[in-house]
Amino acid sequence: MNKRKLNAVMQLHGESQQNLADFLEMSLSRLNAKINEYRGAQFRQNEIAAIQEHYGLTAEEVNEIFFASFVSQKDSNGPAA
């Protein structure tokens, strides 16, 4: 899950996480759990499709956000000092 890219898409459309939570008809805390993959929480296929349509995302953008393995700069440079 590339939460930075999802947040960038939301900002580009002038929306907050609360706006997306309302659109998906879920609580903000549940949305945050899915974005942060807290305790294995993940977006369902229908939620990903709804987000894709809502923001007009391409299939490639959906893959980059939800399916591509994302390594932060800190992680790729080894352990934090």
Predicted regions and their residues:
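A short, Lys/Arg-rich alpha-helix, primarily the initiator
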Residues: 1-19, 23
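Short, charged recognition helix plus adjacent turn
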Residues: 8, 14, 33, 41, ...
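Alpha-helix N-cap/N′ positions at the starts of helices
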Residues: 1-2, 43-46
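Hydrophobic micro-packing sites on short alpha-helices
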Residues: 47-52
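Recognition helix of helix-turn-helix/homeodomain-like DNA-binding domains
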Residues: 26-42
